[in-house]
């Protein structure tokens, strides 16, 4: 009976949509990564577009595959009440005022905002706001492929469907 349940579970697993394997900021601060960037999703519990990103964009199989393979994906509640350590620095929750944005989210102007960090923890790029999966794939691949060092983003967007997407799809299907 256990064998049959295992076989059924294995078969159903292939039918389930891809999911991003999110990590906590605590896990990320202790992770030893060399060949990936950190992708930090700064969100709040009240943010409607944050929930829409989770529901629509991050559930997209291509988005999930890129994030899981090329980045170290982290979710961080920008209103967290925990003190955290990140790359040798300590960040504390804010206790002043109505907008209690965590010290680690300082500089984030709105939610959702996604920040890419190099492996050493230095910020590379902030990406503010909601984006549908079709647009987010372009943004993620721009950084995952290293094309961010070769082309300005506006040119890259124009090239993507004809010149870059076929290469990306081959790479993702390896």
Residue ranges and their predicted role:
Residues 1-21:
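Bacterial Sec-dependent N-terminal signal peptides
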Residues 21-37, 67:
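A short beta-strand-turn-helix
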Residues 22-26, 60, 98:
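Structural motif corresponding to alpha-helix initiation and N-cap regions
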Residues 34-48, 73:
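Short active-site neighborhood of thiol/selenol oxidoreductases, capturing the structured segment around
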Residues 37, 41, 57, 130-134:
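Soluble non-cytosolic domains of exported or imported proteins
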Residues 51-55:
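Detector for the c-type heme attachment site
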Residues 61-64, 68-133, 138-145:
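Thioredoxin-like thiol-disulfide oxidoreductase module
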Residues 130-174:
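Thiol-/selenol-based redox modules, centered on thioredoxin-like
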